[in-house]
Regions:
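Catalytic centers of nucleases
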Residues: 66-94, 98
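Sequence-level detector for tyrosine residue identity
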Residues: 6, 14-16, 59, 82, ...
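Catalytic cores of nucleic-acid endonucleases
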Residues: 1, 87-88, 93-145
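Intrinsically disordered, low-complexity terminal regions enriched in charged/polar residues
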Residues: 138-160
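Acidic-basic catalytic patches of nuclease active cores, encompassing PD-(D/E)XK
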Residues: 2-71
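Generic detector of bulky aromatic hydrophobic side chains
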Residues: 32-36, 80, 90, 117
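Catalytic phosphate/metal-binding cores of nucleic-acid and nucleotide-processing enzymes, i.e., regions
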Residues: 44-65, 71-75, 99-119, 127
Length: 160
């Protein structure tokens, strides 16, 4: 008998153990573009984790809805499942670092809608842009681990 792996996010490990994740600590990068390594740049998983938190804290918390599940895997769909007025919703979260704005292709939209239809769920996509609070890093589109950020929820749209 094989068991499915239980996945736990870095953030959850950080919150529930004494092992503190250095990538989740606030860092003082100073002003301007500092010396940094490739490992200091946020990876796709960290950007999505940030985006899911933004949607949960700044969008869904203001809706009268019930959170059913969240999935912070970059290849996964949906990232967030919630219920509102007895209707099931499945949401995909896209995050980009300015000046790039995240987009969703027609093929992706068709796949998400098809999947949602199997569950009689509404399909929702959320587009979020983040940028460093430092002007030079913002202009460079640089997302460093532990930096301060500004965010914008570009859109949350229902596809079906």
């Amino acid at each position: 008998m094989t068991k499915e792996p239980y996945l736990i996010s870095r953030k959850a490990i950080h919150q529930h153990t004494n092992r503190k994740d250095s990538r989740l600590q606030i860092r003082d990068w100073g002003v301007g573009i500092p010396d940094f390594n490739k490992e200091d740049i946020m990876v796709e998983e960290e950007l999505l984790d940030f985006g899911v938190d933004i949607i949960l804290d700044h969008y869904l918390s203001k809706q009268e809805c019930k959170l059913i599940e969240e999935n912070r895997g970059v290849a996964g769909f949906p990232n967030i499942v919630y219920q509102k007025n007895n209707q099931l919703y499945m949401m995909k979260v896209f995050v980009g670092v300015l000046p790039n704005r995240p987009t969703c292709t027609k093929e992706q939209k068709d796949f998400y809608i098809s999947h949602c239809n199997k569950f009689n769920a509404k399909c929702v996509i959320a587009s979020i842009s983040i940028c460093s609070s430092d002007e030079e890093r913002k202009k460079a589109g640089l997302a460093l681990v532990g930096d301060g950020y500004n965010m914008c929820i570009n859109e949350v749209i229902e596809l079906n």
